[in-house]
């Protein structure tokens, strides 16, 4: 059975579960193509639709998972799905729409949550939370996943310890809005106990590398910065920022303003840890949101350089014209497509300049690399701070090796 993942780590988690389920139930025939889909932008949708069509033309049966196949965590009504993606309708008999989880009671987040099929993987995804109540005005994902649920601490700890017992060296803490862990509603940032969870992971596990997936800034307190000063947390932090302009953040309904971004990014850059100069900051940014002026856009560009954001997930605003409307698509003053493309190009260019300077500052340093791919006499992997490295000889897959970085082996 062939499979492909689009976009996020939560999709990766559930894709692993789905693969294990299909294998257990003997539904993993060679003529099946399993795809985990994403709806973050119209461009993302078009990519997986093209991939599906390619496999349908090969006479494959296609199992569709992820946000593209769901409504509130359940499999989408087929008539609605084919109304959104009419190009797939001629192949209706070969398409199966899947719910979020193959075996989970939607009212009980802990039921069947442990990810099967990862025993041979050294990097494991640990989901701690699902769903979001924030209703950002650009977001379609909120209508796709199931209800906001928090995974119990004892289950999280048990799974991390199991990962290490099976040879794992790194876990990735993930979720849809993971920093809201333990809040009754993700809009109640004061109820979050995310930093407490991270502290307990340090106390109750010994796995050497802990990576935190994308987090929203409004949940982060001084206690969070104290906890992640521990070097077991890799020096790589990914923030869902979207904009640095206050009027745009308000229009997006993000729940924070630029002063909170300044606080969070400044404290991350000043963490009291021995590898402070190696801290990598990644960010999700949307350019050309409705009402965004050139001044608003420039504020964001300047901030990328000011805070040394080393990797951008930059997207032009998508109004989701494929019938699934979001609140922001109804706002006046939509930015013309040519301006959207140009602003995003400029933003990516600035991000690449910052990234290049950051990577070059590591030349000559010895870094630990987790080997993720071994092929044709070469090994590929990532450093603790997520610099991608290619080494011209083969190491054991999922081993951690010391590598002196230079302009030849850093492939970003």
Task: Kindly give the residue locations of the regions a language model identified.
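Cofactor-cradling patches in redox/metallo enzymes
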Residues: 1-98
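Glycine/threonine-rich flexible loop motifs
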Residues: 42-51, 147-149, 248-253
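Iron-sulfur (Fe-S) cluster-binding segments and ferredoxin-like electron-carrier domains
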Residues: 10-20, 139-155, 184, 331
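Conserved SAM/AdoMet-binding glycine-rich loop
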Residues: 62-65, 70-73, 165-295, 305
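N-terminal pre-triad scaffold of radical SAM enzymes
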Residues: 1-12, 109-138, 142, 157, ...
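Radical SAM enzyme [4Fe-4S]-AdoMet core and its adjacent flexible, acidic
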Residues: 181-202, 251-258, 319-353
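Terminal RNA-binding accessory module
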Residues: 327-412
């Amino acid at each position: 059975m062939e499979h492909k993942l689009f976009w996020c780590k939560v999709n990766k988690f559930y894709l692993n579960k789905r693969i294990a389920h299909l294998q257990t139930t003997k539904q993993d025939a060679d003529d099946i193509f399993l795809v985990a889909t994403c709806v973050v932008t119209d461009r993302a949708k078009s990519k997986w639709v093209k991939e599906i069509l390619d496999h349908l033309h090969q006479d494959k049966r296609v199992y569709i998972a992820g946000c593209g196949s769901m409504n509130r965590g359940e499999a989408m009504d087929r008539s609605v799905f084919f109304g959104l993606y009419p190009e797939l309708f001629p192949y209706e008999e070969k398409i199966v729409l899947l719910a979020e989880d193959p075996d989970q009671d939607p009212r009980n987040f802990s039921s069947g949550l442990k990810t099967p099929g990862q025993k041979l993987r050294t990097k494991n995804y640990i989901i701690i939370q699902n769903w979001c109540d924030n209703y950002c005005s650009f977001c379609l994902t909120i209508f796709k996943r199931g209800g906001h649920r928090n995974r119990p601490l004892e289950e999280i700890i048990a799974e991390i310890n199991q990962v290490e017992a099976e040879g794992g060296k790194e876990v990735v803490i993930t979720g849809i809005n993971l920093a809201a862990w333990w809040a009754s509603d993700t809009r109640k940032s004061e109820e979050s106990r995310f930093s407490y969870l991270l502290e307990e992971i340090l106390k109750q596990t010994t796995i050497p590398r802990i990576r935190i997936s994308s987090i929203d800034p409004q949940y982060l307190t001084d206690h969070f910065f104290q906890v992640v000063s521990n070097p077991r947390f890799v020096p790589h932090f990914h923030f869902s920022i979207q904009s640095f302009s206050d009027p745009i953040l308000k229009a997006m309904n993000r729940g924070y303003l630029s002063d909170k971004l300044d606080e969070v990014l400044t404290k991350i850059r000043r963490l009291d840890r021995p590898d402070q100069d190696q801290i990598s900051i990644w960010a999700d940014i949307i350019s050309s949101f409705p009402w965004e002026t050139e001044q608003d856009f420039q504020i964001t560009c300047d901030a990328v350089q000011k805070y040394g954001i080393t990797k951008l997930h930059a997207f032009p605003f998508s109004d989701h014209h494929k019938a699934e409307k979001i609140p922001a698509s109804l706002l006046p003053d939509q930015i013309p497509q040519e301006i959207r493309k140009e602003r995003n190009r400029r933003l990516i260019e600035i991000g690449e300049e910052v990234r290049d300077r950051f990577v070059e500052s590591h030349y000559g340093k010895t870094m630990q690399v987790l080997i993720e791919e071994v092929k044709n006499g070469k090994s590929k992997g990532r450093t603790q701070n997520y610099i991608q490295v290619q080494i011209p000889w083969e190491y054991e897959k999922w081993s951690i090796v010391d590598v002196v970085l230079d302009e030849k082996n850093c492939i970003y």
